[in-house]
Amino acid sequence: MLRKLLLLLFLFSFVLLNAQTDQDSLWVRENYTKKEIYIPMRDGVKLFTAVYTPKDMSEKHPILMNRTPYSCAPYGADFSGRLTGSHWKYYCRENYIIVIQDVRGRWMSEGEFVDVRPFIKDKKANNDIDEASDTYDAIDWIIKNLPNNNGNVGVFGISYPGFYSTMAAASGHPALKAVSPQAPVTEWFLGDDFHHNGAFFQMDGFSFYSGFGKPRPKPTTIGPSGFDFKIRDNYEFYLQAGTLKNLAKMMGDSIKFWKELYAHPNYDEWWKARNARNAMYNIKPAMLTVGGLFDAEDCYGAWNLYKAIEKQNPGIHNKLVMGPWSHGQWSSRDGTRMGNIQFGSNTALWYQNNIEIPFFNFYLKGKGTDPNLSEATIFFSGENQWHNFTQWPPANISNQPIYFQPNGNLSWNKPTASKSSSEYISDPAHPVPYTEDVHFQRTAAYMNDDQRFASRRTDVLTFQTDVLNEDLTLAGPVVADLAVSITGTDADFVVKIIDVFPDDFSYPNSAGQQGRAGGGSYPMGGYQMLVRGEIMRGKFRNSFETPAPFTPNKIEKVKFDLPDVAHTFKKGHRLMIQIQSSWFPLADRNPQKFVNIYEADITDFQKATIRIHHDATNSSNIILPVIK
């Protein structure tokens, strides 16, 4: 009976949602006009641009711009779906002029596309172009040629368009008053999308670039097809693929950026030139960086772009918002949950109505009072509350190491044993999966998924505290400080921060809790919620520029940063740390032999014994940002 009621409620909500979408579509058609234009850049290349203009001529309107490599479709006369399928519709109700542009070399725009095109600081000629100069030229043309605009421009974008928003902020155009990079691609070697601390995120990279990276010899409205996967189990597909050399053969020879990845296995000047933070100096517009605590793609980018702007531009209007979201979830209609974890309210709608729209309204329309947002508006999972801070990381944190102990314990006290370690055998032929389920596409929910499946494996070390007697709140970056020894010459180290729920835990509406494949409610009692996980390719432990082998069986330090956290471990819960040496097929497998992994043969892959030391001299620990 309960399931029937839930089904009826779902169907009723679906009908209401579709009815609202139809109403929004009709309203936009009645109140907006669309035209498509080519805007010339300083080097003569023309960029295809869709412009949606309010019919209301009673006042001048601000311009909100989005530059994208993902197409400004629909092309031609149709337009309503673009403006009503997300929170664009709210800006239509505010009578914004909406401008969406295909970036250079993509879709209907002319020119050559370059991935994360490097910023040119000192431009000396018209051929010195980058995404900042293209944005400048587009804005300049728009404010001079679009009728009835008020001369104020804002730019925002999510993910790769977040990168173009970042570059817009560096354009220096005086009409650009407000910019919001959201889940911005910032650093593709250290933490965003395709590499994390030098480890290659092969699953995202291969599935994305097999389509996105295909050559586009001339402007087109037709998107490329992706790879034809014959195996729909991603673990099995990448295991059978074997090596990155084999993936390269599957990808073929036509995708330029894929070949460039292989040609630059270390953090060299080629990668450094593509660090978006290089452009974040002398920033003039008001900045609002937005990201998700559980963003699988660009969590790193949001945290670290904000910090770079803050450091390199003291005193400017630079704000940060981080909510409990997957990639771009804040632009959806629903932010009440992510995967199995519930947040107690519609966090996405709250953000749209209370932060983003008022931000642009004030700076572009002069509407309302100065939103005067807190420096950082951060949602804390665990307690499910928003908090405001005058700086990030907060001033009132204490970076406290929590130490691994014998018998799988965790303690704030340094271990006293003269010699103690825990070990496991890491076998590349049987890598640790990143999630329990069998599936094809990489899931978004792995970022807060249940880790009980990993706790049961012999190649995963698990350490946990006693039951907490009081709440423990973490706010800021986490540092893994490991003392390790290995029998090979290279290894990966995956560190996972986990919230262990009480055995009797359930949500009030647990009957409707999302289940695994096959239906049914998911058992939340004893849930091991991933709060933050990160991987470190061991050969980069001393330098990302110059990798170095391990000396077999020698104790060495492996210290690396995890992206910031904002989480409260509630009284009655436990804090758990898991350590493992594969995270498959999320990250490529380490052969556990010091080689160029992009060129490794299957014969290079070998088992290794990994030891994590926890004694008085070699005290492995995790440094946690504890709110005092």
Predicted features and spans:
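Accessory cap/linker subdomain of secreted extracellular hydrolases
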Residues: 84-85, 93, 115-118, 125-128, ...
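N-terminal cap/lid segment of alpha/beta-hydrolase-fold proteins
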Residues: 22-57, 464-470, 550
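Cap/lid segment of the alpha/beta-hydrolase catalytic domain
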Residues: 59-145, 194, 332-343, 502-504, ...
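Conserved alpha/beta-hydrolase "acid-adjacent" motif
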Residues: 296-303
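Alpha/beta-hydrolase fold nucleophile elbow
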Residues: 147-159
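C-terminal, loop-rich substrate-recognition/catalytic regions characterized by aromatic stacking residues
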Residues: 229-232, 238-245, 321, 330, ...
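Bacterial Sec-dependent N-terminal signal peptides
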Residues: 1-22
